[in-house]
UniProtKB/Swiss-Prot annotation:
Pfam families: DNA_pol_viral_C (PF00336), DNA_pol_viral_N (PF00242), RVT_1 (PF00078)
Organism name: Hepatitis B virus genotype C subtype adr (isolate Japan/A4/1994)
Activity regulation field: Activated by host HSP70 and HSP40 in vitro to be able to bind the epsilon loop of the pgRNA. Because deletion of the RNase H region renders the protein partly chaperone-independent, the chaperones may be needed indirectly to relieve occlusion of the RNA-binding site by this domain. Inhibited by several reverse-transcriptase inhibitors: Lamivudine, Adefovir and Entecavir.
Record-annotated site: Priming of reverse-transcription by covalently linking the first nucleotide of the (-)DNA: 63
GO biological process, one term: DNA replication
Entry function: Multifunctional enzyme that converts the viral RNA genome into dsDNA in viral cytoplasmic capsids. This enzyme displays a DNA polymerase activity that can copy either DNA or RNA templates, and a ribonuclease H (RNase H) activity that cleaves the RNA strand of RNA-DNA heteroduplexes in a partially processive 3'- to 5'-endonucleasic mode. Neo-synthesized pregenomic RNA (pgRNA) are encapsidated together with the P protein, and reverse-transcribed inside the nucleocapsid.
Gene giving rise to this polypeptide: P
Domain Reverse transcriptase per the UniProt entry, residue ranges: 352-595
Catalytic activity annotation: DNA(n) + a 2'-deoxyribonucleoside 5'-triphosphate = DNA(n+1) + diphosphate; Endonucleolytic cleavage to 5'-phosphomonoester
Binding residues for Mg(2+): 424, 546-547
UniProt keyword terms in alphabetical order: DNA replication, DNA-binding, DNA-directed DNA polymerase, Endonuclease, Host-virus interaction, Hydrolase, Inhibition of host innate immune response by virus, Inhibition of host RLR pathway by virus, Magnesium, Metal-binding, Multifunctional enzyme, Nuclease, Nucleotidyltransferase, RNA-directed DNA polymerase, Transferase, Viral immunoevasion
Stretches the record annotates as Disordered: 215-238, 285-311
Name recorded for this polypeptide: Protein P
Region (Spacer): 178-341
Gene3D superfamilies to which the protein is assigned, alphabetical: 3.30.70.270
Length: 838
């Protein structure tokens, strides 16, 4: 007969009328009983005959998350001009005095951050903006492009100008090597132009280079590109540098990222013959290569012959402006839109500063798309950047690990009678600058509108840009595109032209889609908080990622602290969002928990999710293990607040590990339901002296409670860890002490998931809220009783217990200003010093 919930509760000793613990508890360690219960609760049998359930409430399988919804009204969030001060260490030192080694190391890590991937895979520009919303492709393209433009304007992205130079907006850092600004009318230029026309001898390209550049701002890129670059050069070192630049530029520039800016590009004014000769024939050698590699974006409408017939006037290689002179092909021809405006503005924009960068190809390394900013804010969009290539495959980067305080440490730290407020750091990731050397690895961008549209509507016809007839220009005209562009014209106006061009952008601040970023952000905020705690000794400052909380004794004190700390952070260049500052009173909401003087509980929205989860949980139906992963994720978060904790979820974990479907029996569901509907706070540990000790051997157990000694034997020999756990349970139930000394590391770790299931559940409830102190076997007063010797008394140890705060040190003492004595070197081994109990 299946086990009823009442019986099961009684079995787990969760009811009060259980028999003496010394008899009842060892039974739960019995393997036979555990198997019988598992069979009764239907935990172990993978019933494959019934089809699996793939959806429970909102939980679907791990990889089929909810489909994002496109919102045509999305606005990109506004980014303040974020510029973290480069001398942040000095500024902190002026404020607090010398920094600790730890703080210095962390702040140096992010000034600037560096990124060294093992291998970078370059993707074609078409993959720059992901076709995430096929119905709203054009709209999504422009919204994303606008978002990228906003980021570039805010100084968060670099724009690739040429293979070796990039431009950006905002204040430069010292590690960004600026290219010197020089006007291109220098005496070398004239002779160079006339000389080139001599070499090219077919057409008067030379003299009209500049006029043409003025007219279209991007003439025939490959031809003029290398000539129109009158630019910084030390003639000695040029030879080495020009070769690669000019040669690469043919395959690269047409993709539109680098339109030539006379005042800034990294080739030189003294181009020598070979380079020029290459330019002369480039249109013959490269137009074929380009169209096959699919990168001749801006170049594709120009028949190869046109290079020779330049007397006919300027040729617009700009896809958008070409519509101006063509006849409309239909009512929905783009010509109608292009003729709406006389002046569409420049084809490209250039940043305020130009810097040298490592060689950067005209490719992207990750795709981007837009989603809602968060579930509560659907009016603003958020850019999702997919740099997952760095986390996959054999060449993946192993990201650094960093310590996050566990629940108990967090409670010990923050559970107090302080008043709290939390600060909101706006765009926290975008505070941390990246070294330009990382730019070639973190590229995003787009191939320009014509390519994007062509790729989406590729109706099996091969889009061949080789023979650029006028008909090809109108291939992209369609009713959908026309309607979308008309609507977008209202929003973006003449920016439509700018956004329809290709662009390649690299990150200047750390992006969110790289595993390095959370680590760097955590280092940054924890170092800042450490400095704040020292500067304001009466303030508790603590951070997790971009969530910074401040605590103080009284509300008035908190407000004055808030003002001075905000000013301090602003002086470092950290942007706070004053509208989002939350004042919590005495119970702090942090990391999904509510933390008050009574301890910690999960936040209300999580309790609500738990209730919904149990309401939707089907009984006697096999549930796909991927859905179980989702369920366990939620239940695992709240497990420490239940009676039986994690051990209660062990059957689910086992099932997921073996990739089997899991069937909830009514009793197991009722058991879990009861567990999760009554949550108990996790209390803060208090420091104290340990007076109660437990020890066990496989056959017996012994306790030392104050000056009393007790012992007992087990009916059958048990594994040593199980015996030690039982002894600890007896010590707790006999003495009621919250502090118990034990010499077993497994009991000490308070992870009871590896014990027999029933015993783990029961022990978790008995030992809930107990702290353990390690005592070496040789000094354990309970050692003798456990071996059956009651007569021998070892002296009771005075073992102090200090609550753990994990690896978060709240009390970093500022280093004293060093004296000028040489530091002594110690050769004594730390291991030979007399051992003291921790």
């Amino acid at each position: 007969m299946p086990l009823s919930y009442q019986h099961f509760r009684k079995l787990l000793l969760l009811d009060d009328e259980a028999g003496p613990l010394e008899e009842e508890l060892p039974r739960l360690a019995d393997e036979g009983l555990n198997h019988r219960v598992a069979e009764d609760l239907n935990l172990g049998n993978p019933n494959v005959s019934i089809p699996w359930t793939h959806k429970v409430g909102n939980f679907t399988g791990l990889y089929s998350s909810t489909v994002p919804v496109f919102n045509p009204e999305w606005q990109p969030p506004s980014f303040p001009h974020i510029h973290l001060q480069e001398d942040i260490i000095n500024r902190c030192q002026q404020y607090v005095g010398p920094l600790t080694v730890n703080e210095k190391r962390r702040l140096k890590l992010i000034m600037p951050a560096r990124f060294y991937p093992n291998l970078t895979k370059y993707l074609p520009l078409d993959k720059g903006i992901k076709p995430y919303y096929p119905e709203h492709a054009v709209n999504h393209y422009f919204k994303t492009r606008h978002y990228l433009h906003t980021l570039w304007k805010a100084g968060i992205l670099y724009k690739r100008e040429t293979t070796r130079s990039a431009s950006f907006c905002g204040s430069p850092y010292s590690w960004e090597q600026e290219l010197q600004h020089q006007t291109s009318t220098r005496h070398g230029d004239e002779s160079f132009c006339s000389q080139s026309s001599g070499i090219l001898s077919r057409s008067p390209v030379g003299p009209c280079v500049r006029s043409q550049l003025k007219q279209s701002r991007l003439g025939l890129q490959p031809q003029q590109g290398s000539m129109a670059r009158g630019k910084s050069g030390r003639s000695g070192s040029i030879r080495a540098r020009v070769h690669p630049t000019t040669r690469r530029s043919f395959g690269v520039e047409p993709s539109g990222s680098g339109h030539i800016d006379n005042s800034a590009s990294s080739a030189s004014s003294c181009l020598h013959q070979s380079a020029v000769r290459k330019t002369a024939y480039s249109h013959l050698s490269t137009s074929k290569r380009q169209s096959s590699s699919g990168h001749a974006v801006e170049f594709h409408n120009i028949p190869p012959s046109s290079a020779r017939s330049q007397s006919e006037g300027p040729i617009f290689s700009c896809w958008w402006l070409q519509f101006r002179n063509s006849k409309p092909c239909s009512d929905y021809c783009l010509t109608h839109i292009v003729n709406l405006l006389e002046d569409w503005g420049p084809c490209t924009e250039h940043g305020e500063h130009n810097i040298r960068i490592p060689r950067t190809p005209a490719r992207v390394t990750g795709g981007v798309f837009l989603v809602d900013k968060n579930p509560h804010n659907t009016t603003e969009s958020r850019l999702v950047v997919d740099f997952s290539q760095f986390s996959r495959g054999s060449t993946h980067v192993s990201w650094p690990k960093f310590a996050v305080p566990n629940l108990q440490s967090l409670t010990n730290l923050l559970s107090s009678n302080l008043s709290w407020l939390s600060l909101d750091v706006s765009a926290a990731f975008y505070h941390i600058p990246l070294h330009p050397a990382a730019m070639p690895h973190l590229l995003v961008g787009s191939s320009g509108l014509p390519r994007y549209v062509a790729r989406l509507s590729s109706t099996s016809r091969n889009i061949n840009y080789q023979h650029g007839t006028m008909q090809d220009l109108h291939d992209s005209c369609s009713r959908n595109l026309y309607v979308s562009l008309l609507l977008l014209y209202k929003t973006f106006g003449r920016k439509l032209h700018l956004y329809s061009h290709p662009i390649i952008l690299g990150f200047r601040k750390i992006p969110m889609g790289v595993g390095l970023s959370p680590f760097l952000l955590a280092q940054f905020t924890s170092a800042i908080c450490s400095v704040v705690r020292r500067a304001f000794p009466h303030c508790l400052a603590f951070s997790y990622m971009d969530d910074v909380v401040l605590g103080a004794k009284s509300v008035q004190h908190l407000e004055s602290l808030f003002t001075s700390i905000t000013n301090f952070l602003l002086s470092l260049g950290i942007h706070l969002n004053p509208n989002k500052t939350k004042r919590w009173g005495y119970s702090l909401n942090f990391m999904g928990y509510v933390i008050g003087s009574w301890g910690t509980l999960p936040q209300e929205h999580i309790v609500l999710k738990l209730k919904q989860c149990f309401r939707k949980l089907p009984v006697n139906r096999p549930i796909d293990w991927k859905v179980c992963q989702r369920i366990v994720g939620l239940l695992g978060f709240a497990a420490p607040f239940t009676q039986c904790g994690y051990p209660a979820l062990m059957p689910l974990y086992a099932c997921i590990q073996s990739k089997q479907a899991f069937t909830f029996s009514p009793t197991y569901k009722a058991f879990l339901c009861q567990q999760y509907l009554h949550l108990y706070p996790v209390a803060r540990q208090r420091s104290g002296l340990c007076q109660v000790f437990a020890d066990a051997t496989p056959t017996g157990w012994g306790l030392a409670i104050g000056h009393r000694r007790m012992r007992g034997t087990f009916v059958a020999p048990l594994p040593i860890h199980t015996a030690e756990l039982l002894a600890a349970c007896f010590a707790r139930s006999r003495s009621g002490a919250k502090l118990i000394g034990t010499d077993n590391s497994v009991v000490l770790s308070r992870k009871y998931t590896s014990f027999p299931w029933l015993l783990g559940c029961a022990a978790n409830w008995i030992l809930r809220g107990t702290s353990f102190v390690y005592v070496p076997s040789a000094l354990n007063p309970a050692d003798d009783p456990s071996r059956g010797r009651l007569g021998l008394y070892r002296p009771l140890l005075h073992l102090p217990f200090r609550p753990t705060t994990g690896r978060t040190s709240l009390y970093a003492v500022s280093p004293s200003v060093p004296s000028h004595l040489p530091s002594r070197v110690h050769f004594a081994s730390p291991l030979h010093v007399a051992w003291r109990p921790p």
